[in-house]
Amino acid sequence: GSHDWRDLMAVKERIHLLQDTDDDGKADVAKVFAEGFNQEVNGVMAGVLPYRGDVFATIYPDVWKLNDTDQDGYADKQEVFIHGFGVHAAFDGHDLHGLTIGPDGKLYFSVGDNGFSVRTREGKLLHHPNTGGVLRCNWDGSNLEVFATGLRNVQELAFDEFGNLFSVDNDGDIREERERFVYITEGSDSGWRLNWQFKKGGWPRQTQTPEYCPWIDEKLWLPHWKGQAAYITPPMSEFSVGPGGFKYNPGTALNGRYKNSFFLCEFPVQKVTAFKTEPQGAYFKMVDEHIFLFGMMASAINFSPDGSLYVANWDGKWQPNELGSIWVVDDPAIRRSEKRKQVAELLRSNFARHADAFLIQLLANEDQRIRLEAQFELARRDKFEELLKVASNPNAKQLARVHALWGLGQLEDNSQRDKRLARRLPFTDSDFEIR
């Protein structure tokens, strides 16, 4: 694009559909599910999420919704789901990504510091042109809202089993600081603004402005310290080089060693790091950090229904090529265990066909993905009394109670029910995750 703006349209974005039809661990069917998205204003396709027959994709300046209506493996219906991201022409890749399912049943995604100015379907303007953040909405695009701001460019989002949202944010490309492990709470501001980047290095000479950068000079980027600005939510720790794919073990993946573990791709240094968190006051601290995988430029990761870890290898570094590959990482000792088979079978099943009683049982399942789908289906059926019974039962499994509470939160407002909730919700429960 430096010589001819039409160069920006030369490379198409693609979504590939890969299938292992004979269960030998290798993809034997490959189709281009969708391609194009190569107008001069388009960014990279940095996020893809298939869910309940729809495929959502983040392609700056839009979030797209794709459908294969005739089941032939190709997206024959494509529509702009949300528009208005990328106010600035900032760094490539600082746009849209991180599509994931929240514990409240909403669609979450992250926005880089190219910023956004989005008009919601209800007519409200969400205007944050100089920073990144996290947004969420219903699956029909309604009730789009800003969940958090002040982030530079978190690539992917991961919820732990208690609904705490974490990510790893990119640094500001300023010599004095580095990437950060962040705890993202609703309404939080992590402090970053796009213009901070142009307050250090050679930029002040170019812009003829004083070299003063609040991000560095006011130590906004550092983990909590005495005297830190009170309006920001600081990072938990300095961490990583070039964060990319980020996922949390759903509970039955890999083996017991990696239960409750996060996995982060650090593609410039060719490694995937694993770690866990422990509560520390109102915050968390990182523990058990170590290299999980080394030697490939891993850009994205995800857990399959059978519990193995898929790793996308971005071979060739920054230049477009056809050397990329997808690898499978697993523990061969338990890869085909009965538990793994049961989880995969349940995830393939139609939760709308399961009985209420069975869904209640699944709220205590070891796998986070199954618990969430059971919760969502009970909420869809408006099973108020059943969910309240589990939530208020001190003898029920902890995670079943957590999901029952989330399910209650998904139900429509009802003043009569609110009175019953006020009497029966476990506000004084001995478990702080419940009360």
Question: Each PLM stretch: what is its role?
Answer:
Residues 1-358, 373, 377:
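Beta-propeller domains with acidic blade repeats across secreted/periplasmic ectodomains
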Residues 58, 102, 160, 304, ...:
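Residue-level signal for short amphipathic helical patches enriched in basic/charged
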Residues 68, 415-417:
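Structural helix-adjacent loops and short alpha-helical linkers that scaffold large soluble proteins
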Residues 341-351, 368-381, 399-414, 421-427, ...:
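Structural detector for internal amphipathic alpha-helices that build alpha-solenoid repeat scaffolds
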Residues 356, 384, 418-419:
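Core helices of alpha-solenoid repeat scaffolds
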Residues 360-372, 376-377, 381-384, 388-392:
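Periplasmic c-type cytochrome electron-transfer domains
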Residues 361-362, 388-395, 421-430:
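Alpha-solenoid HEAT/Armadillo-like helical repeat scaffolds in large eukaryotic proteins
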